Design a protein with these regions (language model features):
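Bacterial N-terminal signal peptides
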Residues: 1-9
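Carbohydrate-interacting regions of secretory-pathway proteins
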Residues: 13-248
Length: 248
């Protein structure tokens, strides 16, 4: 019994130490010295989850009516059964509408035949304007912690690594709270909560600014934002069952 108590205490201490190391300013951006998040098994993938009755369905497999290319033109990605598939090198896509505070749900499947490693293995992202939740194959594929799957890219590693193997459907359920500005100054940070495969991996985290690579940048005033799915020019990642709920 005593050994079980000691083991539980040690695990709790490790979790606290990891949480303290997650703050964006605790390490240089993209530092490989940050602790890796603990790995958890999220369980098997289930069937596509139905959208709530008050949701706006952004993609149900039937077409790209709610989407446009990165330049406002036609979507350059493919339709495959009930999913959309990235055409590597064709560019990002984005929603036609702009949104404020929202809950966004989507499912994605990574390429099981990807030849890459680290950041070059099924890399993509879900953007709320300038703020990114990373999409990556992080199943037995180490990389810098603030760039792995379900990281708030360049800022917060996930609380745990809840990745499934590539080739299996995975899900993100994300709550985005927009920053508040007064006279061009951010008086409230943007916040993100993320569930990866139904596991809490980001808990209402305050962002220190927009997403960037290798540098940190400050907030710039903006209004409602488009949801953007990234073409990182790596692999033919698939997305399906995308819906959004506006939060009042």
């Amino acid at each position: 019994m005593a050994s079980m108590v000691c083991a539980a205490a040690a695990l709790a201490a490790d979790a606290l130490a990891y949480e303290e190391n997650r703050h964006p300013l605790a390490h240089p951006i993209h530092s490989g010295d940050r602790p890796q998040p603990p790995v958890v098994d999220p369980g098997p993938a289930g069937p596509a989850a139905p959208a709530p009755s008050d949701a706006i369905v952004l993609f149900d497999g039937s077409g790209f009516d709610n989407w446009q290319g990165h330049d406002g033109g036609e979507v350059p990605w493919d339709l495959v059964e009930d999913a959309m598939r990235v055409v590597p090198g064709s560019g990002d896509i984005r929603t036609r509408e702009r949104f404020g505070d929202v809950q966004l749900y989507l499912e994605f499947k990574l390429d099981p035949e990807s030849p890459g490693s680290g950041q070059q293995r099924s890399n993509s992202g879900v953007f709320f304007g300038p703020y990114e939740v990373q999409v990556l194959d992080s199943y037995e594929n180490p990389t810098y912690p603030d760039g792995q799957a379900a990281a708030i890219y360049g800022q917060y590693p996930p609380l745990v690594n809840a990745s499934r193997p590539p080739g299996e459907w995975q899900s993100y359920n994300i709550i985005y709270r927009a920053p508040r500005f007064e006279e061009g100054v951010a008086v409230e940070s943007a916040r993100l909560t993320v569930f990866h495969n139904n596991v809490l991996v980001q808990d209402n985290e305050p962002l220190i600014g927009p997403t960037s690579h290798q540098v940190r940048i400050h907030y710039r005033q903006h209004g409602d934002v488009r949801i953007r799915l990234q073409d990182h020019e790596d692999d033919p990642i698939q997305f399906r069952n995308i819906w959004i709920r506006e939060l009042k």
